[in-house]
């Protein structure tokens, strides 16, 4: 019997970013209308769309072999799963998000202990309850169905526990962060039995390798340039690289071709410096994956 890896794709805010990431790895996932079972161009994988909040529970219980979800939702469900890989990406950025405790700007609440006996609104109910229990602070934790930031403004809660990447929504609602509760990022997780299966483990290792390579590729760019012999040492010394830059002599010339990989955020400052040192014909190109 042909084996298939039952794989969960997070539905909602992470869905588009996940599908785009898989595409860069060579897997095309096609979501057909309202179907919860997308097509994928790999006969070894069967996909299912599932909310990130439910993913860990379904992987733990074996409904799915593996899936992608946030570290926060694994903690919320207290799920016993195998973490195959940490993958730092989200709908908005390539950095971890944070669950924070926030109150109104003009609130007298300044520290965690000031929340004793108060009402806290959040979607992350179970983790929040455990957090305050460990701190020995008695609070009333209420589940929020959405628009959590407005709960403080409307007087329905004294504080909220909410996820943020840029803090822009927090600031827009005139809220003030009093504590960072946890950092979270996407994780590739597997059911323990699936991880023991040689076929499924090998497939998951392949997925993890390529996803991590694609994420690293997003942060880096390649640079090629022609460099005169007289300026070669000075230019090579300017260049960061995964290892060392590749240097090759040009045919019947006193020039060299130099190629390297650099951080995409530093290249804007690096290119003028390279030109000042004599580099010519500089080409910057994107990297699909860096393994």
UniProtKB/Swiss-Prot annotation:
It comes from Desulfosudis oleivorans (strain DSM 6200 / JCM 39069 / Hxd3). SUPFAM superfamilies: GlnB-like, Periplasmic binding protein-like II. GO terms for molecular function: ATP binding; ATP phosphoribosyltransferase activity; magnesium ion binding. It catalyses: 1-(5-phospho-beta-D-ribosyl)-ATP + diphosphate = 5-phospho-alpha-D-ribose 1-diphosphate + ATP. It comes from the Bacteria. InterPro entries: ATP-PRT_HisG_long, ATP_PRibTrfase_cat, ATP_PRibTrfase_HisG, HisG_C, N-reg_PII-like_a/b, N-reg_PII/ATP_PRibTrfase_C. Keywords: Amino-acid biosynthesis, ATP-binding, Cytoplasm, Glycosyltransferase, Histidine biosynthesis, Magnesium, Metal-binding, Nucleotide-binding, Transferase. Its main location: cytoplasm. Its cofactor is Mg(2+). Transmembrane segments: none annotated. It holds the Pfam family HisG. The keyword Cell membrane does not apply. Catalyzes the condensation of ATP and 5-phosphoribose 1-diphosphate to form N'-(5'-phosphoribosyl)-ATP (PR-ATP). Has a crucial role in the pathway because the rate of histidine biosynthesis seems to be controlled primarily by regulation of HisG enzymatic activity. GO terms for biological process: L-histidine biosynthetic process. Belongs to the ATP phosphoribosyltransferase family. Long subfamily. Its EC number is 2.4.2.17. Feedback inhibited by histidine. One of its GO terms (cellular component) is cytoplasm. This is ATP phosphoribosyltransferase. It is found in: Cytoplasm. It is an enzyme of class 2 (transferase).
